[in-house]
A protein has these predicted regions:
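Carboxylate-rich, polar loop motifs that coordinate divalent cations or form catalytic acidic clusters
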Residues: 1-198
Length: 198
C-alpha cells in the first residue's frame, strides 16, 4: 500500500509540475556575445521585458537575442556621459535611470537618447512613483517639471553615506547606509533610530 501511495504522490507531483511549468532557458552572456565588460554592477528589466546591464564599460541592452552596448561618445550630448554604470532603475513608463560614477542619467526608450540629469557624486538611486537619490546623508526627489532634484530629507547631525533606498507600501522610506545601519523615514518625515541587528 505504501508503494501505491508513493507512486500516486509522485504521479501527482509530476503532473502538477508539467501543467504549471514554464519553458525557462538560461544563457551565459559574455563579451563574446557583445557584453561590454565582464563585471556586472546592476541589472534591470523594463516594461518591455528588455534586460539592462550596467558595467564598468557602459550600459548593455539584452532583448533575449542580441546585446547592444551604449558608451560615452565625446561631443555627443545624447550619449551616455559616463561609462561606469553602478545602478539601474526605471519608471516602467519609458524611462530608465542610471546611477553612474559621475552622476545620474536618463535613457528614453522611445527616442533612444540619453539625458544627463545630474553630474557629481551620488550614492544611491531608487524609483517608486518618483526618482529618489541619496547623496551622503541627504535624499532628493527628481522634479520632472523643473528638471531639479529637490531636497526630500536631511539626516541632521549624522555623518553617514546612504547606500540604498526603498519605499514600502506604507510610504516609509527605508535608507540603508554604509556602516550605520538602516533608517526608516515615515511619510510625515519622522525618522527612526538606526535599526541594528540585536
Amino acid at each position: 500500500m505504501k508503494k501505491v501511495t508513493l507512486l500516486f504522490l509522485l504521479f501527482l507531483s509530476i503532473s502538477a509540475v508539467h501543467t504549471q511549468g514554464q519553458n525557462i532557458t538560461f544563457s551565459h552572456l559574455t563579451t563574446d556575445d557583445g557584453l561590454s565588460q565582464f563585471s556586472v554592477n546592476s541589472m534591470y528589466i523594463d516594461e518591455r521585458g528588455i534586460i539592462w546591464i550596467g558595467t564598468r564599460e557602459g550600459l548593455n541592452r539584452y532583448n533575449g537575442n542580441d546585446i547592444k552596448s551604449f558608451k560615452l561618445k565625446k561631443n555627443d550630448p545624447n550619449s551616455l556621459f559616463s561609462n561606469t554604470v553602478l545602478r539601474i532603475t526605471g519608471n516602467k513608463k519609458g524611462k530608465v535611470y542610471l546611477l553612474c560614477t559621475d552622476g545620474i542619467a536618463e535613457f528614453d526608450l522611445t527616442t533612444q537618447r540619453f539625458k544627463t540629469l545630474l553630474q557629481g557624486n551620488v550614492d544611491a538611486i531608487y524609483y517608486n512613483e518618483k526618482l529618489y537619490i541619496g547623496k551622503r546623508e541627504e535624499v532628493f526627489v527628481y522634479n520632472e517639471s523643473t528638471g531639479n532634484f529637490d531636497l526630500y530629507y536631511h539626516l541632521a547631525g549624522k555623518d553617514i553615506t546612504l547606500s540604498c533606498l526603498h519605499l514600502d507600501d506604507k510610504k516609509n522610506l527605508w535608507m540603508g547606509t554604509t556602516g550605520n545601519g538602516v533608517y526608516c523615514l515615515s511619510e510625515n518625515k519622522t525618522v527612526s533610530q538606526p535599526i541594528w541587528k540585536s
